[in-house]
């Protein structure tokens, strides 16, 4: 019994050491800028995948209608995103506008991205929601600077003019009834 316990400990320690070294290695990969900076009042082109594993470029792939982009930075922002989208959809804005949510995550490495995408995909079964959720792995500081986003404490939303990357209006936090009226006026 003593020998088998020692053997188990001997076999488990190298596995733990390997996992520790592996995760330290992947977490230290250099960050790459995965978007192009836009001009003033322009939303930068950012690449990502929706939760159906389709590559998308925001806003370039959504030019047939005005586009509402809701940008989130923290996992707990999902409730704020959902409230905003519920307000938009209950007022049939999804018929006249493309509405997407863009969770932004600091660029790490492909293995981490695959894992995080899988976790998000597993939690969302609705194909419509999977299609409109485009995860962007990018340099968050540069992204925030380009869009004059001061911090990651809340969500930020942008109304983009049809066929362009021009920001018509933008706001922060849950979209309110008053902001909805402003969006509808464009």
Which sequence ranges carry the predicted segments?
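Thiol-/selenol-based redox modules, centered on thioredoxin-like
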Residues: 145, 153-186
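Soluble, non-transmembrane catalytic domains of enzymes that act on hydrophobic metabolites at membranes
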Residues: 57-61, 72, 172-177
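N-terminal "domain-start" segment that seeds a small globular fold
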Residues: 31-59, 78-79
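Short active-site neighborhood of thiol/selenol oxidoreductases, capturing the structured segment around
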Residues: 61-81
């Amino acid at each position: 019994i003593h020998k088998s316990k020692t053997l188990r400990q001997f076999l488990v320690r190298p596995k733990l050491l390997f996992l520790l070294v592996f995760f330290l290695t992947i977490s230290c990969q250099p960050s790459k800028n995965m978007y192009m900076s836009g001009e003033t009042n322009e939303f930068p082109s950012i690449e990502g995948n929706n939760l159906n594993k389709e590559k998308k470029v925001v806003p370039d792939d959504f030019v047939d209608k005005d586009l509402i982009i809701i940008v989130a930075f923290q996992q707990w922002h999902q409730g704020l995103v959902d409230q905003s989208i519920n307000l938009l959809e209950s007022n049939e804005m999804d018929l006249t506008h493309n509405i997407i949510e863009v969770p932004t995550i600091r660029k790490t490495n492909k293995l981490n991205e695959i894992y995080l995408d899988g976790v998000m995909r597993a939690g969302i079964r609705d194909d419509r929601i999977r299609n409109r959720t485009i995860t962007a792995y990018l340099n968050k500081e540069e992204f925030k600077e380009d869009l004059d986003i001061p911090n990651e404490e809340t969500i930020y939303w942008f109304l983009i003019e049809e066929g362009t990357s021009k920001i018509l209006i933008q706001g922060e936090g849950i979209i309110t009834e008053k902001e909805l009226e402003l969006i509808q006026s464009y």
